[in-house]
Regions:
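Blade-edge motifs of beta-propeller repeat domains
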Residues: 1-22, 47, 53-77, 113-172, ...
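Generic beta-strand/beta-sheet core signal
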Residues: 3, 30, 42, 57-59, ...
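Acidic/hydrophobic-patterned starts of short beta strands in beta-sheet-rich repeat architectures
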Residues: 34-42, 89-98, 184-193
């Protein structure tokens, strides 16, 4: 859907470009290396049954194309919540995806029964009373969440099996994912909610010397929480864009501050804020790094 200032929203996607319906569990937005945002959508992936998985839609100015497979983020089981975050203040965004559906006996997979059921007449498939008994069956349970680290050039690698990271070792049924800096030190942490289980809180224990900057934005003419605000930070050889949508994702709410990892850059060339009201505001480029700043929309 595309924003139409006169009529609200209009259907902007070309029906001829549709790639078919999928499971669509959660959506997340990020500017990876473009002036346009990319949209990551979690789906249900199961090898030999549902082989397509997550999608990463990138806009080229005319239409969106799926780069989920090219970037290595399409396979992560029965996906739910997902969030982009900067794992080391390098300015490069990585991605965490929670997964898992029903944890039963690992030796009793319900997927085969679902595959057999799908070949039955539509009247049987659409009526749950004809479905095989699910008691004790496993439907994408015991899956491990995915930690996709962006190693540059937007190529992501799943590090969830790295024993040192201790990612979802209990293989709980992941649901919501939120990003927050609860220590206010520029190190973004993750909290993950799990169905029928305890929540996870992941934090970086080995801080590096990369610089960062963060902003708490307050709207005046715009909404007070500045939801929908867009910020651009220009460094000597790089421009970074963030938008504030803390409510994105499945059953989660993230830190309402915008965070920028700056890598080894020790100064900022330019800072522009594009408020939801339509107003553009420029900040002084000599602003202090490695702290959060509160910025109020100019009247």
């Amino acid at each position: 859907y595309q924003r139409d200032d006169l009529n609200g929203f209009t259907l902007g996607s070309d029906p001829q470009r549709h790639v078919g319906a999928k499971s669509g569990m959660s959506a997340e937005l990020a500017y990876l290396d473009s002036e346009y945002p990319s949209v990551f959508v979690t789906h249900v992936y199961k090898n030999n049954y549902l082989p397509f998985g997550n999608t990463l839609w990138r806009f080229n100015g005319d239409y969106f194309s799926d780069y989920g497979g090219d970037y290595g983020v399409n396979q992560c089981g029965w996906g739910w919540g997902a969030k982009f975050f900067d794992v080391n203040n390098s300015g490069v965004l990585s991605l965490y995806v929670a997964n898992g559906f029903i944890a039963g006996d690992p030796q009793k997979s319900y997927w085969y029964k679902l595959a057999v059921l799908s070949s039955a007449p539509q009247g049987i498939v659409s009526s749950p009373k004809y479905w095989p008994n699910m008691k004790g069956q496993d439907v994408s349970g015991h899956e491990q969440d995915c930690l996709f680290i962006n190693e540059g050039n937007n190529r992501f690698y799943d590090y969830s099996n790295d024993a040192d990271l201790q990612i979802d070792q209990d293989r709980l049924l992941g649901r919501g994912v939120a990003v927050l800096d609860y220590l206010n030190n520029g190190s973004q942490a993750l909290t993950v909610s799990n169905q029928l289980g305890r929540a996870y809180l992941y934090k970086i224990t080995h801080l590096n010397t990369n610089n960062w900057i963060g902003f708490k934005l307050i709207g005046t003419k715009s909404n007070r929480d500045a939801v929908g605000v867009k910020m651009e930070i220009t460094l000597q050889n790089k421009k970074m864009i963030r938008e504030l949508y803390p409510l994105n994702g499945y059953s989660s709410q993230s830190d309402s501050r915008l965070h920028f990892g700056l890598g080894n850059a020790d100064r900022i060339e330019k800072i522009n804020i594009y408020w939801p009201s339509g107003k553009k505001q420029e900040l002084q480029s000599d602003i202090k790094l490695n702290m959060y700043h509160t910025i109020k929309e100019e009247l």
